[in-house]
Amino acid sequence: MNLGENATINVNNSAKAASYSKAPRGLYATSRGAINLAGGASITMAGNHSNESYAISTETGGSVDGSAGGRFLIDGDLHAAGATAATSSLPQQNSTITLNMTDNSLWSGASYITSVSAGTGVISLQMSDATWNMTNSSTLTDLTLNGGSVVNFGHTDGEPWQTLTINEDFTGNGGKLVFNTVLNDDTSETDKLKVLGNTAGNAFVAVNNIGGTGAQTVEGIEIIEVAGNSDGTFEKAGRIVAGAYDYNVVQKGSNWYLTSFIPAPPDPEEPDPVDPDPVDPIDPDPVDPDPVDPIDPGPVDPDPVDPIIPEPEIPVAPPVTEQQYRPEAGSYLANNYAANTLFMTRLHDRLGETQYIDMLTGEKKVTSMWMRNVGAHTRFKDGSGQLKTQSNSYVLQLGGDLAQWSSDGLDRWHIGAMAGYANSQNRTQSSLTGYHSRGQVTGYSVGLYGTWYANDADKTGTYVDTWMLYNWFDNKVMGQEQATEKYKSSGITASVEAGYSFKLGENERNSYWLQPKAQVVWMDVQADSHREANGTRVKDDTDGNLMTRLGVKAFINGHNAIDDGKSREFQPFVEVNWIHNTQTTSVKMDDVSNDMRG
């Protein structure tokens, strides 16, 4: 539709103007011609700026007015070219495009403004419940983003990053800008919003990470540049993550940046001093004093005074600033730790409650089958101290002896098989960002064990216990506002434990024991390398841990007087252990490692 020479046409919401690749323009207003769009329009233009084919184009003072609002479906570019000079009867007039996109409007294209000596083109855009998929760097005169409106910066590999330039003012009323950024350090490539005038209101920012692995920033990645008054605010629409880091949207001066750095808190403001209201002085009546004889004091030696040495000023330390670690790191750590420790046992975890008295012979015996049920709670912090993790776990293990024998009639050998099921749930919270993450581990184990007692009758003297398990797990990490991540882990755990039981004394009903012991456990359950939905590569960075335990246990074997002649016995105990690990549970997210601390 071409219009010119001071002509005017009104298009209501039932009309649709269309053009195709063989025509240069969809809507074209020139020479002070005006097209008024009441209620929106559907315009398709297969061409683009490169071949001067536009969905809407105005030149030499032409105008397209869609300010009344409506549903626009625009596939193509916009172009406002210059102005028409004033004449003896008409004023100078800019070429103008005004659109108020509402009601799920959709525009896919770019916006271009050119200038001539007579003036500059004008493209004014207001969006409410509308989407603009920007296909190339664009220029607008002004932009208002109301609620439900989205501007999506486009990006194609190998193509330049896009810039949206606003020649005058930007106003945010709850709309959203979606940038593409390589989330790394300050030098990262990114799309940008450049406002040559002022900003006002509030808008949201979302970021598509284009291959960034996360890095420590100093100033940050500049995404919004404001030349005028920067009164508008921008806040992130959701989490912005890359690698091990969370990024924030922060203002520095007039501009806005993406930063993984926690900025230093501002200096406290000192209140302005308040001048008290002046008070007129009171002039008392003069009083004649009574005469007093003068006193002639004798000489007085002053007491010596120690010189005052001023305290040196203590320099004020600069405020502490930190990088923001993602809480998902804590969930990966908790999952890896659980996978290596859920099925770890000591001898008496398996056999401590399996002794019984044969009712026919009165002999103490050991059952060939055993079952272990354990619930546990664990807490830890990560290496940065920012992430606090709590986990709850449940373990069920079943086992039984396959063979028992004695080599000398006094000792006893046991060989058996065991299997287990375990589940662990954990939750990590960041003390800096407040974001949280949840983890889950569910898995099984199968293996063999062997035990030797030097004295099977009363278990005095030396014992040696060993076991080996194959373990496999399904793991989940569910970060706040992130996709659920699933991965597997598997590997071997094995143990050798030895101890010696001393009988310290006994009386009618009780015997008193001391048992020093040592245990070495090999832990090598490894998680599969995993790439998150956001592109972060996660790797279990723990290379086979050897845990050593040295301890001593003091216990009593006995029964109450009311249980004389019965098989009920109790075994209260106190145990102290020293534990050492050759490796710390560690996870690497892209190039950043984090580990598990106490």
Where are these regions (language model features)?
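Transmembrane beta-barrel architecture of outer membranes
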Residues: K22-P24, R32, S53, G61, ...
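Extracellular beta-solenoid/beta-roll
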Residues: M45-G47, E59, S63-N198, N202, ...
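Residue-level detector of the transmembrane beta-barrel scaffold of outer-membrane proteins
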Residues: D77, A110, V178, S368-R372, ...
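Interface/linker segment at the passenger-translocator junction
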Residues: T181, N209, E219-V226, E235-S391
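Outer-membrane beta-barrel and related beta-rich outer-membrane complex signature
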Residues: E219, G385, R427-S431, K476-Q480, ...
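Outer membrane beta-barrel translocator domains of Type V secretion systems
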Residues: P310-E508
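Structural signature of outer-membrane beta-barrel domains
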Residues: A376-T378, A422-N426, L469-N475, V521-A527, ...
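Outer membrane beta-barrel transmembrane domains
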Residues: G447, D524, R537-G598
